[in-house]
Amino acid sequence: MNSSLPYLEWESKLGNVHIEGGFNYSHGNLVVPRKGKYRVYLQITYEGDQSESCNGEKMVLKNSVFLFSDSYRKDTLLLSSQDTVKCDMHNWSKSLYTAASFELEANSRLWVRSSHPGFIAKNYVFTFFGAEFQTGHVSDT
């Protein structure tokens, strides 16, 4: 996972970006294969300890999933989750999960931003992103 970009890049070969069901993954984006209703989901687990950089008494962790579609042509916030950790905690771990269903157009792109990418857990089992097709017409594009 590349954390130096304004969006997160995922390792599609190890399984932390889920690209089943016709999705393509390209440069941090999940590309929607066809028009329909999709369940979009994201979990990011953060880890750290008090010796790592933390300003103030607490750190606010925030994840966001954005959508870019050809019809709107602007990044739109779809999902967001946030929580806080106290800066004096030793060896802390915090998982943030969010999911919801949306009507998406074919070729729309989903991407993720994290407030603190340097604290994302290195074990891919705890951090994942994807979408599942729920309903729609297979021939719709």
Stretches with model-predicted labels:
Residues V112-F119:
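Short beta-strand-plus-loop segments that form exposed binding edges in beta-rich domains
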Residues R34-K35, L67-D75, E103-R109:
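A short, structured loop/turn motif at beta-sheet edges
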Residues K86-N107:
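Short, surface-exposed tryptophan/glycine-enriched loops
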Residues M1-K35, R39-E52, Y124-T141:
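Terminal (often C-terminal
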Residues M1-G21, F66-S93:
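Conserved, structured regulatory domains from eukaryotic proteins
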Residues Q43-E47, D70, P117:
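Solvent-exposed coil/turn segments that connect beta secondary-structure elements
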